[in-house]
Structure formats: structure tokens, C-alpha cells
Amino acid sequence: MKIRGRSLAACAIASAFLGFATPSSRYAEPGPVRVGQASDSLHDWMRFGWDVGRSGASTAPTGITAANVASLHRQQVQLDGTVDASAIYLHAVRVGGATHDVFFVTTTYGKTLAIDADDGSILWRYTPPGYDSWAGTYRITTATPVADPDRHYIYAAGPDGYVRKLDVADGHAVWSTAITRLPQREKIASPLNWFRGRVIATTGGYIGDRPPYQGHVAILDAADGTLLHVWNSLCSDRQELIDPASCSASDSAIWGRAGAVVDSTTGDIFVATGNGPWNGRDNWGDATLELSPDATRMLGNYTPANTDELDRTDADLGSTSPVLLGGGLVAQGGKDGKIRLLRWTQMDGTAPHKGRELQVVSTPSGTDLFTAPAVLHTGTSTWMFAADNGGTAGWILQEDRLRPRWHNSDGGTSPVIAGGLLYVYDPRGGLRVYDPESGRGVVVLLCGPGHWNSPIVADGRIALPEGNANRHATSGVLDIWRLK
């Protein structure tokens, strides 16, 4: 799970750019709706990727359009930590005895902050016990928190290997549960998810793949924090939270930007694993996996025919999470510069499945895919958008094939779609806004460099953290753009 480098040099970017040559979801779970002023309604953005299926495509109006996006005003909020992840957002919640629209973020060293979406003030911060012992060290998290649908609580991860339930009103911890026995080796890198009263978390390792660690899926009771179940991608015959040293195999991180992806119809959990041994029995490195909603059973699996080569050359399949396209189709990228289109019914069951891809296409620039593609269902068509360090591209799904529609050489992190616009953060600096179906550039909003950060868009506002977790800084910036 070694992370290949990317340039972080800041660059000055114009506020508009030319168009380019040459596209959710049944998984959507929009938050509560209330009448408001910024758009037709006020809406929440409760998790990374908008919905449980991580489509990255908001179904809510935003009030931001191609006609007014260039006029947004930016505020830079100074934070006491770097947020190498995304924000989440709840509108009209009670914090400190008053009603606020609030962004919530978790820093790389585990502080979780509530930020007033109107003025950028810090409403509260939660600092986990032991913070001073790891702040400034290699021990980090890049996990985005998730909100409970009741809108009274959020769930956040820390470098100590704990998931915590925090009260929206004041930030106090309701419960705290460990999902690893060795946080010095096992990292919570991916965003948390929530479905049907359960919090879903995954674990990976740190840069350099220092053993021992095993990627695993942890299921927690959202009410009281009980660790209900663990599915281990190595030693998968052991359905418990294991001491990593007690398993003869190591690695197989679950570290993709989208983490655990949930089919909202069945509740099934999809994950992808990184470098590690694969034997098709109890070791599942470099594989795409479907688990039952409680993570007690494996329901389907796929690994490329060259899985041993992927492991040997550090070309993790699990550098990105599975993409649910609908119609039984799943897309799976990787560090080998390829995106594989899979008919998932051919991958059913516990018997091992190698190869049998419907199609293999290149990532936007043919390099590592570390980001979470976005999926847009228009009613008549399905589009997929992806960005890597060297480009951004859009495909349309036709006759079980991804057909390229546009492409450019501007790199980006995980794309999001909101209010009919496609937003892609360039980690060198700048938030690019596109027309999704044509790829025409609408504007570039000025901001600084980052790493895996990505934006959210709701209620006439955009929130985007800056900064790189691997700099080990204890300060950072949250950019908030607002309609004037």
C-alpha cells in the first residue's frame, strides 16, 4: 500500500478557463428537507460520496449554477489540524443552544471540529485522549466522518484506532470503540459509512506497508458502539478482531477513498483490498469483494488474473473502491492505471473468480487511480467520472460498455456532482468546475494545494479542505465559498 508521490507545488490559477475536447443514483439517501433561502430547499451532505453507495452525485438543488459559480466569495478558515478528507454538512441543527448550519471535519490527528457554515467560526472541537502522543507523528487518519440520520450525532475516527459517536450539540463523546488491536500499524484511512443503524469502518496500513496488519471491515452498533462483527481480508476464516501478529499473512489494506460502499437496496457491502496474498479461500489480497450487510459472509469476489503480479509490483487493486454503476455492473480501478468493468452476477459466491472482465479501460492519464469515481444517473443514461494525477475524464455507459465522452490533462481528486455541475479539486491548487456531459470548463475557483481532499456542495456553499496528511502538520485550512 505504498503511496506514489504527486507534485504539490502551488500554482496560480485563473478564475476561468477554456473548454476541453471530447459522463446517482439508486443508492441515494438524501437527508431531511426544509424550506430555506439559499435554494429551493435546504439539504444535508451526511457522508463522503453523498449517499451510502458513494455515487458522489447529489440529488439536491444547491443554488449554485454555471451562471453564478464564478461570483462565489471564498473564506479561508484556519484550523488546528489538516483535513486530508472531506467535510460533511448538517443544516439547521442545534449547537450550543442555537440553530446553525454546520460543517464537520476530522483532522489527520483526530480532532473533530464543528464549523459554522455562515461565518466560519469554530462552534466546538473534540480532541481524543492521547492526542499529544501522536500529533506530529506518522500516525494519522484520513477518514471523513458520517452523520446519523437523526442529525443529533456524528461518528468520527482517530489515529488511535477508535471510532467515536459525538453529540452534534456540543461535541462530547457518547461512546468510543476500538476497531483494531494495533493502531500503530493499522490505520483508519477511508471514510466511515452508516446504514440501518450500523456504522461501517475499514482499516488499512501505513505508507511502507510495515507489517503486521490486515485490512478488515468493522460493523458497530450506532446506538451503543458495540463491535458487532469483523470480516478480515486475510485469515478471513477468523471472524473476530484479531491481533495482527496472530495471522500468518499481512497487508491487504482496505484503504480506497470511498471505503465501504453499500448497495442501499440489499445492504450488501462492497470493498476492494490492496497488496497482499490471495489464495481464493481465506486470503483475499488485491480483490473486489461483496459482503453481507452484517459482514458475516462473503457473497461475491473478483481478482484480476494477474493478482500475483499486482502484489509483486505494488499495483494495488484497492487503491480505489468499487463503483456501483447499477444494472449489476461494477467498475474497479487500481494503481496499474486500469479500470475494469465487471458483471457482478458472474462473481457471485465464495468460489474464487479470476479475470472475466467485461471491459478494461485506461484511467484518465493511464496512471494510479487513488480517487473515488462519481456516478450520475440522468434518467436516460448513466455516466461515470474519474480523475487521477494527470487527467479527468467522463464516460457514458452504453450496452454494458464504458464509452469515452471527454478527457483532459488536468489532474484531480474524487469528483462530485451537485446542482448540475461537476467539481474536481486539483491537488496542485484550484477547484475546477465543469459541465459534466461536455467536459466544458466553467470556472476554476482559487485555492491552495492538497492531497486527497475533495469538496462538498450544499445550500449555496462549497466546502473544501486543503493540505496533505503526509506533511504531518497540526494546522490547516478549510475553504468555504458562498453565494454573495
Regions found by a protein language model. Name each.
Residues 85:
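Replace the tail clause
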